[in-house]
């Protein structure tokens, strides 16, 4: 059974970044890190309601290889997606991108969203494709709606890191995280609906660093 989503006591009002919230940095290795800032966005409930109702959601097909048969086929991704260039994105995405740019020193110009409708929606272990074009991409995620688990694991094997992100939380992956680590949003029985709004940048970005 899917749990109903309950609005946060702190999620009302107009959506806006809270400049007083300072992210906590989690060092994954010598060149990879994650920043976590709970309640970074005020008014998260209003953004959740608006983006769920108005975004041009699409459920994409993904080609999958079957090692047992040697064949391939397509499956529906277990989530809905959409995306914009930042100038065309609905509010408050441009203001959020501006706040992230001021903090991380790169111009965030693309925004995408994943809608996890219930606990059976998920995304498998992966590194973002931006790793093919950027040495140290910064990927910033604003979470809206119900809490969900977020996992990270090193590509070469080793202990994983498990986090829980709630509505209004900011999670940022930086350094060589997309190259040397994978991340996932696993299935979570009973979880309510959640949207992740992800900001990326086309410019080269910084050199790998944990500072």
Kindly label every feature range from the protein language model.
Residues 1-211:
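Non-heme Fe(II) oxygenase metal-center motifs and adjacent flexible, charged/small-residue loops
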């Amino acid at each position: 059974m899917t749990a109903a989503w309950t609005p946060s006591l702190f999620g009302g009002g107009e959506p806006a970044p809270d400049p007083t919230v300072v992210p906590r940095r989690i060092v994954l290795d010598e060149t990879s890190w994650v920043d976590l800032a709970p309640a970074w966005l005020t008014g998260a409930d209003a953004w959740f309601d608006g983006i769920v109702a108005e975004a041009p959601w699409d459920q994409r097909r993904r080609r999958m290889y079957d090692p047992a048969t040697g064949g391939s086929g397509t499956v529906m991704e277990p989530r809905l997606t959409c995306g914009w260039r930042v100038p065309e994105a609905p509010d408050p995405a441009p203001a959020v991108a501006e706040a992230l740019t001021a903090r991380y020193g790169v111009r965030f110009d693309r925004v995408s969203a994943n809608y996890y409708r219930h606990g059976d929606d998920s995304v498998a272990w992966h590194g973002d494709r931006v790793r093919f074009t950027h040495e140290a991409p910064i990927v910033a995620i604003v979470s809206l709606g119900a809490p969900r688990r977020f996992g990270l694991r090193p590509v070469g094997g080793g202990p994983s890191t498990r986090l829980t992100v709630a509505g209004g939380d900011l999670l940022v992956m930086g350094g060589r995280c997309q190259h040397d680590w994978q991340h996932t949003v696993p299935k979570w029985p009973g979880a309510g609906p959640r949207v992740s709004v992800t900001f990326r940048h086309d410019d080269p970005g910084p050199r790998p660093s944990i500072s």
